[in-house]
Amino acid sequence: MSSAVPMASMSTYAILGCGSVGHAVAEQLESEGKDVLIIDNDEGRVEALRDQDLDARTADIAETDVAEVIADRDVVLVMSADIEANKTAVRHVRERGGDQFIVVRASDPVTADELTELGVDVVINPSEVIADSALRALE
C-alpha cells in the first residue's frame, strides 16, 4: 500500500465522522471541487453540514451497511474521535474486498500500528500533527 497517491487522481471521497477535523477536511475537498459524502452519527451535526450544502447522512460509522453506502468512493477518510468505531469501520471497508484508499485518525502509536495491520493506507495522529506544526513554527 502506498501513501503517495496523487490527490488529483482521486475524485470521490467519504468522510466517516465529521467533528472539527472531518469538517475541515470536507471544506477543503469541497473547495477543490471534489465529490464528498459525509457520514456522522450526530443528527444535529449532519443538519448543520447540510445547511452548508454538504452531502451529509446520519449513520453510525461502525455499522456494516456504511461500508456498502461508501463502496463507490475512491478514498475513505475515517476521522472520528472514537478510535474503536474507526477500527470497526476500517474492518468493514476492507472486508468488502475493495481497493479504496483509506486514511484514518489514530490516538496513539499502538492504535496506529493496529490500524496499519487492518490495511489502512495512511494513519494520522492529530497530536503528532499539531506537535510537528508547532515545532515548524519555531524554525
Language-model regions: role of each:
Residues 1-139:
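Cytosolic regulatory regions of ion transport systems
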